[in-house]
Design a protein with these regions (language model features):
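Histidine-dependent nucleotide/RNA phosphoesterase domain, centered on the 2H-phosphoesterase fold
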Residues: 1-233
Length: 233
C-alpha cells in the first residue's frame, strides 16, 4: 500500500477498534434486517475464492453462530456504491434512479468502455463491528473509474457516496462482548498476498440480508486484454 492507502486503512482500523474493544457490540442498526443497495462490483477469481474460503473456516471458530458468510461462488469486489443501502426497504433515491436509470446505465457503459483493466492486490484483513473485509489496492485505474462514475451520477442528479476502500466482504457479522479483542488480533495477524485481475464489472442490486444473493442489472465490460473470471451461474 502507498502512504495514502495505509493512512486510510489505519484510520478505519482505529475507528472500528474503538467500537469493538470498548463496547464489543454491533453498531449497525441494519443488522439482521432486509438491506438492499445498488453497487458496482467485480467478480472474484478462483485464487481469491480459495483464500477467502480458508479465512471463513477460521472465522467460524471466532464469530457468533448467526454470522452470514458470503457464498464463495458469489464472492465479489466492491468498487463503487451507486445507491446507499437502507434497512427494511428500498434505498434512498431509488425512485429517482428508476426514472433515469436506463440513460445513466448507458452512460456508465461508455465510461467503462474507456476504463483500463485493473490489478488489485489484497494484503490486509479488516475487522469492523459488522463485517470482516479484505482490503485491496490498485494502481489507480479503479480510482479513475470511481471518479468518472461520481461525476456521471452527480450530473444525473443522483447522490454519490464513494466507498472508502476497495474491498471484498468475507463475512457479515460482528464481535460479541468477550471476543472483540481476539477477533482484532486475528485480523492483524492475517497477511495475505493475492493479486486480482479485473477486466469487467457489474452493476448489481444487492439484497444483503438474509441471503446475500445478488441480481445482475447490467454488465459493464472494461476495455483491455486482461482476462475476466467466469461469472457465477
Amino acid at each position: 500500500m502507498n502512504q495514502e492507502e495505509v493512512g486510510r486503512y489505519n484510520q478505519m482500523r482505529a475507528r472500528y477498534r474503538a467500537t469493538v474493544v470498548q463496547r464489543g457490540l454491533r453498531e449497525d442498526t441494519a443488522w439482521g434486517q432486509p438491506y438492499d443497495a445498488l453497487n458496482v462490483q467485480a467478480w472474484a477469481s478462483p485464487p481469491l475464492k480459495d483464500h477467502v474460503g480458508l479465512l471463513q473456516e477460521e472465522l467460524k471458530q471466532l464469530l457468533p453462530a448467526d454470522t452470514r458468510y458470503v457464498p464463495v461462488d458469489r464472492l465479489h469486489i466492491s468498487v463503487a456504491c451507486l445507491l446507499e443501502g437502507r434497512s427494511g426497504g428500498r434505498p434512498e433515491n431509488a425512485s429517482r434512479w428508476e426514472k433515469i436509470g436506463a440513460e445513466c446505465l448507458e452512460s456508465l457503459r461508455d465510461v467503462c468502455a474507456r476504463a483500463r483493466p485493473a490489478r488489485i492486490r489484497f494484503e490486509r484483513v479488516l475487522s469492523t463491528d459488522v463485517a470482516v473485509l479484505l482490503v485491496g489496492r490498485d494502481g489507480g485505474e479503479l480510482d479513475v473509474l470511481r471518479r468518472c462514475i461520481g461525476d456521471l451520477m452527480t450530473g444525473c442528479g443522483l447522490e454519490y457516496r464513494p466507498k472508502e476502500i476497495i474491498h471484498c466482504t468475507v463475512a457479515r457479522g460482528g464481535p460479541t462482548p468477550g471476543n472483540g479483542a481476539e477477533l482484532l488480533h486475528w485480523a492483524d495477524e492475517r497477511y495475505i498476498d493475492v493479486e486480482e485481475f479485473v477486466g469487467g464489472v457489474d452493476v448489481l442490486w444487492e439484497w444483503t440480508y438474509p441471503s446475500l444473493a445478488t441480481t445482475t442489472e447490467a454488465r459493464l465490460e472494461l476495455a483491455g486484454p486482461l482476462p475476466r473470471p467466469d461469472r457465477p451461474s
